[in-house]
Amino acid sequence: RKRNKIYALSDGASSYELTPNSPLPLLIQQNTEAGIFIGDDVNADEPQEVILFIRTNKKDSFSVSINGSALQQINADYPRLYDKLTGIKEPQHVTAFIVPANVVIQGNNKIVFSASANELILQRVELALKYGSVEECGYF
């Protein structure tokens, strides 16, 4: 409980002879859906901050909602601060959305993406639950 965590949708790559059950990579069109399971009881232990990291094949605009709530606030510094740019190759891009803590639920969370751009591909999804400082609550 109250440990910093990251929940992720795999990019679909196989490792250790295991093939993940993931919808990624996923072409983002109008109302493209992906689900992410959150094991934490976020109602009992509300995180200080929830951050949704989205990696796409290129930099382009798109919209995203979680459980029906549209996400508006982006923090351009977070991909670097949370070390999400390591291994990223041009023209890939990582966007960090701030998620209201009351939007996320324990269990399956529905994420809906929409983009008008052609061939915008969702490559990775990570949802970070920040409960406190690294010293108090551990690394992500």
Q: Model-predicted segments: where are they?
A:
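Beta-strand-rich recognition domains
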Residues: R1-F140
